[in-house]
UniProtKB/Swiss-Prot annotation:
Subunit composition and interactions: Heterodimer with IL12A; disulfide-linked. The heterodimer is known as interleukin IL-12. Heterodimer with IL23A; disulfide-linked. The heterodimer is known as interleukin IL-23. Also secreted as a monomer. Interacts with NBR1; this interaction promotes IL-12 secretion.
Family: Belongs to the IL-12B family.
Annotated protein name in UniProt: Interleukin-12 subunit beta
Disulfide bonds: C50-C90
Carbohydrate attachment residues: N125, N135, N223, N315
Entry keywords, A to Z: Cytokine, Disulfide bond, Glycoprotein, Immunoglobulin domain, Secreted, Signal
Originating gene: IL12B
Keyword Glycoprotein: yes
Length: 327
């Protein structure tokens, strides 16, 4: 008896949930229709309702068709392909009453499409969004690549709204002036700055930050997700104020300072440094790793000294190199 009740309840949830999942509101008057992209799929039945108290003499038009596509307060569409997506508007007597925009999110062989963004080919898995933080303040930047140059819209937000998640607020996505070339093909680079709403830089991270990026291209919708701890995306800014002081012979003292952006106090948020002397005529560079902000080096004319930084206690990414000539 109990088994029968459980079976009936489970099927009821499935039958009720399936239609609700096929179409959902992305933002005001914009709806995403989830479509099975297999050739024999019937598509999704979508019913649009004109936002008006009027009942008669209502006609519907589409931005893909100059003629009326229907009449009455509701319009039923069988959405199967991109030709069925678009902007649908209801009118009466030449007056626009309301409109609805339909976007398609396609699933092929059980996999949601990822056509808009470039896979940045992480060795372990597909990576579409990459993020970096210059310190432990909870502020970080994410970026992505696309070969598409027009009709794009992006929105990055927290992937969860639950009380035990790490809430994040992201700004508007911006197009970088930098063009990225991969395998001889040029890509547009977009980025967004995000800030964790509540931060405690000295606390141990137990929950990852989760992000979802919603992408629109014309009438196509896709979403991409990523999750990480701030400690895993740390990349310090390079050291600043490099100075050389003569000692004896070719020996010199190289000194530098922590980057302004690095977390304080430095006694707690320590950096370690990689010092390298590069001589054009020698194949091997002289390298040393130090915890302090100075090092004794052998400097000769034509050589270049460079320094980069890394989190002292965690295996973060190294900063960019910053250099000074020996001469």
């Amino acid at each position: 008896m109990c088994h029968q009740k459980l079976t009936i309840s489970w099927f009821a949830v499935v039958l009720l949930a399936s239609p609700l999942m096929a179409i959902w509101e992305l933002e005001k008057d914009v709806y995403v229709v989830e479509v099975d992209w297999s050739p024999d799929a019937a598509g999704e039945r979508v019913v649009l309702t004109c936002d008006t108290s009027e009942e008669d003499d209502i006609i519907w038009t589409s931005d893909k068709n100059s003629e009326a596509v229907g009449s009455g307060k509701t319009l039923t569409i069988q959405v199967k392909e991109f030709s069925n997506a678009g902007q649908y508007t209801c009118h009466k007597g030449g007056k626009t009453l309301s409109h609805s925009r339909l976007l398609l999110h396609k699933k092929e062989n059980g996999i949601w499409s990822t056509d808009i963004l470039k896979d940045q080919k992480d060795p372990k898995n597909k990576t579409f969004l990459k993020c970096e933080a210059a310190n432990y303040s909870g502020r970080f930047t994410c970026w992505w690549l696309t070969a598409i140059s027009t009709d794009l819209k992006f929105n990055v937000k927290s992937s969860s709204s639950s009380s035990d998640s790490r809430a994040v607020t992201c700004g508007a996505a911006s197009l970088s002036a930098e063009k990225v070339t991969v395998d001889r093909k040029d890509y547009q680079k977009y980025s967004v700055a995000c800030q964790e709403d509540i931060t405690c830089p000295t606390a141990e991270e137990t929950l990852p930050i989760g992000l979802v990026m919603e992408a629109q291209h014309k009438y196509k919708y896709e979403n991409y997700s990523t999750g990480f701890f701030i400690r895993d995306i740390i990349k310090p800014d390079p050291p600043k104020n490099l100075q050389l002081k003569p000692l004896r012979g070719s020996q010199m003292e190289l000194s530098w300072e922590y980057p302004d952006s690095w977390s304080t106090p430095h006694s707690y948020f320590s950096l370690k440094f990689h010092v390298q002397v590069h001589r054009k005529r020698e194949r091997k560079d002289e390298s040393q790793f130090v915890d302090k902000t100075s090092a004794t080096i052998r400097c000769s004319k034509g050589a270049e000294v460079r320094v980069r930084a890394q989190d002292h206690y965690y295996n973060s990414s190294w900063s960019r190199w910053v250099s000074v000539p020996c001469s």
